[in-house]
Amino acid sequence: MFKNYLIISVLILLVSCSDSAYFDPGPCPRAAILKGNETKEMNNSDLVVELNRTIMICEYNLRRKNINFDVGVFGDVINSDTVTLNNLNINIFVAFVGPDDLIIDKWSKSVSVKLKNQKISSFSLPIEGLRSKIEEGRTGSSYKVIIGLE
């Protein structure tokens, strides 16, 4: 009985005195499209660009208190059969949002989407090598990654 009590006491002591520099931030922040399903009509054409869904992978660097992440964006270009373009350039932004909806970092990326001679051309875009700061004591669920069209 005393042996079990001693083991539990030692474990509690170790956990309570552990170094706070190695906090567990938990899962990756949630990546979402700005309006749930963002649509934008392109100037001087019938083209409509639509962002549908995202995927995100992340890695925490706890010593430097930052997060490295990559985002994948999936979408469609609608009415691509009505234009003679082979490629369409679109501008996408990625915002890393912290607690209280404070924007910590924002990036813009101009990407080229290859159009097919179809009513709807689907695309997927990798956005890699993003890095942002995190606060100690905050978990991954305290942050969001918002993606949209500029």
Where are these regions (language model features)?
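Sec-dependent signal peptide recognition
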Residues: F2-V10
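Extended low-complexity, serine/threonine- and proline-enriched intrinsically disordered segments
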Residues: L88-D101, V145-L149
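One-face residue pattern on beta-strands with alternating periodicity enriched for small/polar residues
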Residues: N68-F74, N91, I146
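Bacterial signal peptide processing site
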Residues: S18-A21
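Short, solvent-exposed beta-strand/turn "edge" segments of beta-rich domains on protein surfaces
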Residues: S45-D46, M56-D70, N79-N86, D100, ...
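Short, solvent-exposed, Trp/other aromatic-anchored flexible loops in extracytoplasmic proteins
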Residues: W107-S141
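Post-signal peptide N-terminal segment of mature Sec-exported envelope proteins
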Residues: D24-S45
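C-terminal motif of bacterial Sec signal peptides marking the signal peptidase cleavage site
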Residues: L13-S16
